[in-house]
Amino acid sequence: MKKITILLASLAMAFSVSTASKAEYKFNFVMHSDTNNAFWAAVHKGFKDACDQVDADCQMLTLSGDGDQQEQLQNLESSIAQGVDGIVTTITHPTIFDAAVDEALAAGIPVITANTDHPGGATGSN
């Protein structure tokens, strides 16, 4: 949970600072599972708690079936179309999400991967 709090705080600080009565930022967590799994239920709670701490409007987009990469890709593309301020996602395929991540970055939407080792990074770098 501490990593998620730091992650969201970092995303929030990346944007201009102003005061508003409603949530200033919208973040989506696009995951490859649902929250029926105890691990992802804990991640969901941590994500929600972190969002509450930075007063962000956050959604965790889960799948109707565990591991459905096409549904996950649709959720990622939907997040981009919504113009969210940042996306956290798991990358479960080496190439299927590349175009969507590139599209998000081109639109100025930061994308952070979670629970995913980068093939060019150190093992356990997630």
Map each language-model feature to its residues:
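C-terminal segment of classical bacterial N-terminal signal peptides
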Residues: 13-22
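Sec-dependent signal peptide recognition
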Residues: 2-10, 14
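A residue-level marker of the well-folded mature domains of exported/periplasmic proteins
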Residues: 3-5, 21-126
